[in-house]
Amino acid sequence: MITKNKTISKLKRLLFSLLLPAAITTAIPLQAQTCTSKLPCQLRIASYNIQHGVGMDQKLDYKRIADILEGISPDVVAVQEVDSMTRRTGNTYSLGEIADHMRYYASYAPAISFDGGKYGIGILSRKRPIRTEQHALPGREEARTLLVAEFDDYVFAATHLSLTEADLMASISIIENVAKKYDKPFIIAGDLNAQPDSPFIKKFQKSFHICNNKGKSWPADNPRECLDYIAVYKSYGDVRRPG
């Protein structure tokens, strides 16, 4: 399995918080900016790569992750690098453990079989989704997936994209075709494995408005690159940064 050796700390890891009312506000972690959008609801959204629940101290600690998330009180969270019933996590359902601590709903999408169990992505949500669906995405070095959860007022998708540029570019049309199916705001969040000036992000932004401020998010102990994003599908309405 090929993945970046991403780490988390007890008190600091990339956590986008995003408000989606008549305006969109993003903070990472203390900086802020505002965007405008025709959205019917107010949401706080986070994206968190948990590295199978193990922190920079090499300790598996689901409650620590839950505590960090509860500190920003998100409505919905995109979660990456999530184990389910693997030996290295003691045969636990990692997303369910975090959800239990937070009293949230857990939606899981395995991408590959690994270490006696599964490895993939998930969504934690304050409200129960109306429905969820999973879509395969290109991944030459490792299978990738898109998890979509529909709620009353919006649709939320979580993903962790490939490290390969060709796979990244091929993923855009798949994600866009999924977004087109819905007549409500479609929001996507996750680890896109691409920097803001990359060909992928430039093409991605033709269909999706990136709402976070593109602050550096990786590696956690000394962030040098922006790889994590929250974005809204543009076809729903006008989404722009004022000024």
Regions found by a protein language model. Name each.
Residues 63-68, 97, 148, 173-178, ...:
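Alpha-helical elements of Rossmann-like donor-binding domains used by nucleotide-donor carbohydrate transfer enzymes
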Residues 15-27:
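Bacterial N-terminal signal peptides
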Residues 2, 7-14, 28-101, 113-115, ...:
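N-terminal, active-site-proximal structural segment of metallo-dependent hydrolase catalytic domains
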Residues 42-54, 133, 148-162:
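Active-site-proximal beta-strand elements of phosphoester/diester hydrolases
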Residues 48, 80, 159, 189-191:
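Active-site flanking residues adjacent to catalytic metal/cofactor-binding acidic residues
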Residues 35, 57-58, 82-154, 242-243:
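Structured beta-strand-rich core segments of catalytic domains in phosphoester-bond hydrolases
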